[in-house]
């Protein structure tokens, strides 16, 4: 599995993920890029679950973003509908975390589109550890979103055997295009 974390603070949204790909109890790859930019660099997305499944979902989600002129919520709802009703897509096992400068969402294969409390997303096997860390940092520090994401992923990587510390971080600052952190 993996860990993906997204935090929104002070007009910025950051998302990061680890790089571990596991097959059963074996680490197959340590430097996978599970967080990427979509739709003209205006959206960041991360996945937890099967790698091949996630790439299929990224393609479908980006097509929905194009179809709906970058409207994140509309694209997420349409992807969730397709995911739930399409026989081939229903077999895909992954979760998507997506964010733009206005919204942060989790998209599931059950047809759910969830806007989390406090714009904090943490998915994957290390998600609960990263969520607890990010929440504590949000409530008790003035750290920037990208720093909270990084520290949360490091903590999750220390605890979860399916999460490493080879991190990919992306950030969107207001209406600017995302930058690699």
From Swiss-Prot:
Reactions catalysed: ATP-dependent cleavage of peptide bonds with broad specificity
Localization per Swiss-Prot or TrEMBL: Cytoplasm
Any GO BP: proteolysis involved in protein catabolic process
GO molecular function, one term: threonine-type endopeptidase activity
Domain of life: Bacteria
Catalytic residues (UniProt): 2
Main location per the UniProt record: cytoplasm
Regulation: Allosterically activated by HslU binding.
Enzyme Commission designation: 3.4.25.2
Chain positions recorded as Na(+) binding sites: 157, 160, 163
GO cellular component: HslUV protease complex; proteasome core complex
HAMAP family: HslV
Quaternary structure and interacting proteins, as annotated: A double ring-shaped homohexamer of HslV is capped on each side by a ring-shaped HslU homohexamer. The assembly of the HslU/HslV complex is dependent on binding of ATP.
Family: Belongs to the peptidase T1B family. HslV subfamily.
Protein name: ATP-dependent protease subunit HslV
């Amino acid at each position: 599995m993996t860990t993906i974390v997204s935090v929104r603070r002070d007009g910025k949204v950051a998302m990061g993920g680890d790089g571990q790909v596991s097959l059963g109890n074996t680490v197959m790859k340590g430097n996978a890029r599970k967080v990427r930019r979509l739709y003209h660099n205006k959206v960041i997305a991360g996945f937890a679950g099967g790698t091949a499944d996630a790439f299929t979902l990224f393609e479908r989600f980006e097509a929905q973003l194009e179809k709906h002129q970058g409207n994140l919520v509309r694209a997420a709802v349409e992807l969730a509908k397709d995911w739930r009703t399409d026989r081939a897509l229903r077999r895909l096992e992954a979760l998507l975390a997506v964010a733009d400068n206005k919204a942060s969402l989790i998209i599931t294969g059950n047809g759910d589109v969830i806007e989390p409390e406090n714009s904090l997303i943490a998915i994957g096997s290390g998600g609960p550890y990263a969520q607890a860390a990010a929440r504590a940092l949000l409530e008790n520090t003035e750290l920037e979103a990208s720093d909270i994401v990084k520290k949360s992923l490091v903590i999750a990587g220390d605890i979860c055997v399916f999460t490493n510390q080879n991190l990919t971080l992306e950030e969107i600052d207001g209406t600017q295009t995302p930058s690699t952190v």
